[in-house]
């Protein structure tokens, strides 16, 4: 949620930025009308409350003098009814303003390039050289099925499209990748390993910005009578970031760096027909997520650091990748600046996203009321939150299978994974 003071004091400027940079049309007339109603109702309720307090004292004085206070009590009742009605009207207007505010995307940082979609993202760097093969390249589907490690038919039987079953050495490599990532982030990058629920309530989803705008992208549970509704997490960012919801953090304890390995569940609404085969776009996939809660003056530095941590995974696996700065038209709803890391996928002869690292500024913190305070200070400040994939495990498996394939259909195990696979150096044939 962007700063409501910006909407009150710089509405026209904010609306223009949202239109140009986010292709978001803010209804300024409606918001202005609601804000006028809010001000009037605020004054009305405050005046009624003040008058009610004054009348209450007058009744006490009249009673002490032995006067008949019945007429005064009747007036108090009438004033109480007026106050209740005014408060209800004010609450309704505030709720409507809040709903509009929750639908507004974050404002991009000044250095984010203007653009309409991913074709206008800015490439920052490339690392590694894509391998030249002297044999016909197989895709990860063929490699996995020939190794008896990927079974998409079984996934479809058990659940439907966009599900897979992994077995044997492929399943072991998938697990090894996640363990390697966790060990790297906790032992070298300073993150605290965190285990979180895979089901979360709606307040948690509002906190990180999935609700109310992206409800159709989630898998929702059927709430039993008397129970609150839940949704399966689309990313560990949701529960991990919300650990600081409604918390005032000692600034001396910042940054807080957490990592979690979880399954992620996405309906992939709007992705019909895209990546229908293989592990690239699944309803259920594993990811190692990194989250940082930082001093609001240091979040841009933190974004560079966090992105570097994701890059380190790719570098140690010796997987060629490129780093791109997303343009305004390709950024996520709550981000003010995002880098994507795209890994080389030989069978597609292109780079595919494997990590997205974002600075959310105070957008999520305002929703969550996550604040910090320096020792001796009376005022609190909203923290800044960042998140990034470190990495998507399934897509990393795709990249390893395809980049490390051999002419006989076997796959060489990257050196950094061998300790996690009992010293195994080749899988498959």
From Swiss-Prot:
- Which GO annotations describe the biological process of this protein? selenocysteine biosynthetic process; seryl-tRNA aminoacylation
Q: Which UniProt keywords apply?
A: Aminoacyl-tRNA synthetase, ATP-binding, Cytoplasm, Ligase, Nucleotide-binding, Protein biosynthesis
Please name the top-level EC class of this enzyme: ligase
Highest taxon of the lineage = Bacteria
Q: Which reaction does it catalyse?
A: tRNA(Ser) + L-serine + ATP = L-seryl-tRNA(Ser) + AMP + diphosphate + H(+); tRNA(Sec) + L-serine + ATP = L-seryl-tRNA(Sec) + AMP + diphosphate + H(+)
The Swiss-Prot or TrEMBL record annotates one GO molecular function as: ATP binding
Known pathway: Aminoacyl-tRNA biosynthesis; selenocysteinyl-tRNA(Sec) biosynthesis; L-seryl-tRNA(Sec) from L-serine and tRNA(Sec): step 1/1
Provide the residue positions that the database annotates as binding L-serine: 235-237, 289, 389
Q: Where is this gene product found?
A: Cytoplasm
Per the record, what about its domains? Consists of two distinct domains, a catalytic core and a N-terminal extension that is involved in tRNA binding.
Q: Which family does it belong to?
A: Belongs to the class-II aminoacyl-tRNA synthetase family. Type-1 seryl-tRNA synthetase subfamily.
Protein name (Swiss-Prot/TrEMBL): Serine--tRNA ligase
Q: What is the native source organism of this protein?
A: Haemophilus influenzae (strain PittEE)
